[in-house]
Amino acid sequence: MDSAETELTPAPEGRKRYSDIFQSLDNLEISLGNVTFDPLAGDPVRREDLEPDKADTATVVTEENSEASSWRDLSPEGPAPLTEEELDLRLIRTKGGVDAALEYAKAWSRYAKELLAWTDKRANYELEFAKSIMKLAEAGKVSILQQSQMPLQYIYTLFLEHDLSLGALALETVAQQKRDYYQPLAAKRMEIEKWRKEFKEQWLKEQKRMNEAVQALRRSELQYIQRREDLRARSQGSPEDPPSQASPGSNKQQERRRRSREEAQAKAHEAEALYQACVREANSRQQDLETTKRRIVSHVRKLVLQGDEVLRRVTLGLFELRGAQAERGPRSFSALAECCVPFEPGQRYQEFVRTLQPGAPPPPSPAFCFQEFTAVVHSFPQDTKKKFSGPLPPRLEEEGSPEPGPWEVASLGSQGIPGSDVDSVGGGSESRSLDSPTSSPGAGARRLVKASSTGTESSDDFEERDPDLGDGIENGVGSPFRKWTLSTAAQTHRLRRLRGPAKCRECEAFMVSGTECEECFLTCHKRCLETLLILCGHRRLPARMSLFGVDFLQLPRDFPEEVPFVITRCTAEIEHRALGLQGIYRVSGSRVRVERLCQAFENGRALVELSGNSPHDITSVLKRFLQELTDPVVPFHLYDAFISLAKTLHADPGDDPGTPNPSPEIIRSLKTLLVQLPDSNYSTLRHLVAHLFRVAARFEENKMSANNLGIVFGPTLLRPPDGPRATGASPVACLLDSGHQAQLVEFLIVHYEQIFGMDELPLASEPLTQDPGLAPACLESSPQHPASLLAQDTQPLTIALDSSPDPKHHSALEKCPEVTPPELATLQRDQREEEVEDTRDGAGDGSSHCPEDLALGAQSRGHFSRQPVKYSRGGVRPVTHQLSSLALVASKLCEETPVTVSAVHRGSLRVRGLGPAAACPEGSPLRRNPLPKHFEITQETARLLSKLNSDAVSRTTCCADPEPEESEEHL
């Protein structure tokens, strides 16, 4: 009212007096309204006369009214509320008013942030509590409804439904609170905070400009004062103009003084102009500062008012929302209490008894009597499974009894009734642990009979099985797992529970619980079975060995001329399903999958399953294997010779790699260089070139010509020495050599028939079978079965007279009758006996010479036998992957014994015992005679080998100089 009266025009004295009277009456009415007693009542009502609950309610209402009145009613003596203009004017006139307004806005934002955090945390707690109550109510409702005819069952069902409805209401309330309270208040807080920072930045900028203007004004004022003082000093110190009769020297001095005075006057005028400009700038900045101050104060006030309005609105909405939620609970509980009042105890029990069907009364129980002992002679132990032949008790003789007696019910319950306490507690044999030794006690326990293995499941005792190994076949036919997805390679193993800590062959991590194969003893995590790449070889898996980044001659092989199994497996898989794939050997595979394949080769060697991998990953593994060899396929000491030959190809236009008929000199020179390669290097290079020849033959499909393959494999097969010998090699020479390398490899691919011979093109070996019954035949990357290899082992020892295609060798043998002494016949018989024994011992590992085995070997690669096979765990360990000493001895014997040349076909490029410079007739195909692949040293074998060595020496002396012309023709 005071603020309203100040804005009105002055009234007459009488009117002013009436307004004071009205104001006094209003104050009196307000003061009388705050009094808590009724003047019309007799005695005031005492608090003790009220009921306890009503007294408490009255106290709460009185306190709330007093607090609300203190917040709502203002005392007449208190300050009147200020208008918006007065608020802004007071802040403007107060020193630091703008900073105070901005600080209040910051405090308001912090206050709103605390409110939001508190409400959000409270809502989260309520949400978790409501979910827990609903979950508990659901479980309790299911448990209560399972019982029938229980007291107050309907009431408690309503109670649980009430909890569910209250929980749903709480969830809805929390969601609505976040939508109606949290989001608007948070948005307003962010808006206020953003504008506060903007206003603060503007205020700081204006203050900085004002300070700069004031400093410039002070500097210009000081400069102006100094210039004026200088001008006054020079004007006062100069004398009056002398007469014209003065000397010329005095005239110069006067002229100098005059110029100095003019300069001082000009500087004074300049300083004065600068000073006036700074004054104007300072006044302008001060006006801008005042304008900014008014604007910032006004906007801050509006932002605070808007924030208060939003806070008031969302708070009212929150209280209404919470009030509606809280009102529902008391009403529901009061309704439940009203429903519970008319319940009579024992009412449900009476209903339960009425539901029973009363029948005829049971006959009275017979009295028990004493029976004397009667001796019974038995000629054999009594069989408890037979029917009892003695006199039955009276109770058992009654077959028409309507219901059993109580002792019969007890006996039946002890045997196990569905739903009885025995099953619930876990007294059944099925509920006990399968690994416990006492899980199957007595003769009545379940015993699993061992069955012959089918290659998929273990036939060990039931106690040794993993609980995860079950009967389910959800993950594939024959899969022993219910939870884990098995890879194709994992399905070939016979898995069982791991019996001790071991190292996983797949991830190279130690484990305590896992799986183990019964035959190859491969250990693996259960989760790693999904990505396992190692097939079961049905014999103990050899230890892990490094294959990448090692010397070429140190790679595991069974005989000197064998191609490394990494190369044979990769090329066989590519030729089986990816010869026509576009970009083969040019597109790189995934780095992660390539690493896994390399690790699988080092862990499982030749037993790696490649059918499920991308062809680009397989080619990347092959290229990486060749690149990381410390000594490449073409040795370092022959690198210069091959590069020189490649340069001659490049120099002669007629010897271009694409020329269909190259010059015979180039072919002869290249064959001479190839003869100098070691045995394994030659076989590997020939195998790789044959594979690339097949790839280039399908150029129209895969877009990989011989030129492209030469670019890919040139720097891999031919590498310059990287040791001290290569210190003088320049980068330019290496760059030029790369072109020659690619050209030479292209030449080898294009002219494979003229260089190696088309009739001896190595056949593409079949990929490793996934059938567990055929897996032993593929062990250790052997291209043949062990039995056939054993038969081949005996051929060099028995000289193989019948297999020689050349009649000249028969004539040479006829000239030397000492070639077949009686000891040699004994040796042949012993070798045959050892062959038969080894074939019988390893019947499951390979094929034999019988017609049935030959027919089985001629079947398709997808054929497998279902006949169960029992493999022994303690079998012979696999051959160590080193250069076999016995194989080297046999190779040496073959080199020293000219008679073994009969086993070599006509037209071979390399002959054992001849030097590397041996030449062959032009156009003859290049062939090699594979040495025995596997030997098993025993005392008897060593004795026979020593005797064979002595016989070979005697034969050498006997056939010292056969006909030279015939041998040259044969070569």
Swiss-Prot record:
Phosphothreonine: modified positions: T659
Official protein name in the record: GEM-interacting protein
Subunit structure: Interacts with GEM through its N-terminal.
ZnF start-end (Phorbol-ester/DAG-type): 492-536
Residues where Phosphoserine is found: S19, S75, S235, S238, S247, S436, S440, S884, S908, S924
InterPro entries xrefs: AH/BAR_dom_sf, C1-like_sf, F_BAR, GMIP/FCHO2-like_FCH, PE/DAG-bd, Rho_GTPase_activation_prot, RhoGAP, RhoGAP_dom
Region (Disordered): 41-79, 231-267, 383-476, 799-865
Keyword Zinc-finger: yes
Protein task: Stimulates, in vitro and in vivo, the GTPase activity of RhoA.
Biased composition (Polar residues): 59-69
Entry keyword Nucleotide-binding: no
Molecular-function annotations in GO: GTPase activator activity; zinc ion binding
Annotated Acidic residues bias: 458-471
All residue ranges annotated as the F-BAR domain in the record: 85-348
Gene Ontology CC: one annotated term: plasma membrane
TM region(s), chain numbering: none
Gene Ontology terms describing biological process: regulation of small GTPase mediated signal transduction; small GTPase-mediated signal transduction
Keywords recorded for this protein, A-Z: Coiled coil, GTPase activation, Metal-binding, Phosphoprotein, Zinc, Zinc-finger
